């Protein structure tokens, strides 16, 4: 692999697959606006920023990238593996079809945007550095952000499924 590569921007290229295994020095990866259905960045312990938002392909107008009202999309990324990404600080994965998100090894996160996915359960309790959480338009039934002392911004709107919200002990909110 490209063992010394530190930054890769491959956004808006109509990519259907992306293999970054072996890119162990990678610190920033931008792959938004492609047609990926899975992304594996596991073990990239130097990765600080990952942006892979909006990888949905327009189905009713194949090959088109410009968005029109009424377009029909696939789910975009439905499999995301970020295990071992212990340096990750910024994670932007909005507008995909991600059903679950394991953040247990991403304890350095300060910014998380996972809005407009299919996430039904989200554990952020270990994210003590988190300042911004955008998780709107998901399938969460409960959200507990209590005790996240650095959390300044929380966006959790447009979730009819949400019946429980705990924002206690968040002095920065």
Where are these regions (language model features)?
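Consensus "Asn ladder" position of solenoid repeat domains
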Residues: 13, 34, 55, 75, ...
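Intrinsically disordered, low-complexity Ser/Thr- and acidic-rich flexible linkers and loops
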Residues: 55-76
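Leucine-rich repeat
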Residues: 2-4, 23-26, 44-47, 85-88, ...
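Sensor of tandemly repeated, compositionally biased sequence architecture
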Residues: 25, 37, 46, 57, ...
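Canonical leucine-rich repeat
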Residues: 8, 18, 39-41, 60-61, ...
């Amino acid at each position: 692999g490209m063992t010394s590569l530190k930054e890769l921007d491959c956004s808006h290229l109509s990519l259907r697959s992306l293999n970054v295994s072996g890119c162990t020095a990678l610190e920033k990866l931008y792959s938004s606006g492609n047609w990926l259905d899975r992304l594996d960045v596991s073990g990239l312990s130097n990765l600080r920023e990952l942006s892979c938002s909006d990888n949905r392909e327009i189905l009713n107008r194949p090959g088109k990238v410009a968005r029109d009202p009424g377009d029909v999309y696939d789910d975009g990324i439905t499999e995301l593996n970020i295990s071992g990404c212990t340096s990750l600080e910024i994670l932007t994965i909005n507008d995909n079809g991600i059903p679950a998100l394991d953040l247990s090894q991403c304890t350095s996160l300060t910014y998380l945007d996972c809005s407009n996915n299919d996430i039904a359960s989200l554990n952020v309790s270990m994210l003590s550095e988190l300042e911004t959480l955008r998780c709107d338009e998901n399938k969460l039934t409960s959200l507990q952000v209590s005790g996240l002392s650095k959390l300044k911004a929380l966006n959790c709107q447009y979730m009819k499924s949400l019946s429980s919200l705990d924002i206690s002990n968040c002095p920065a909110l």
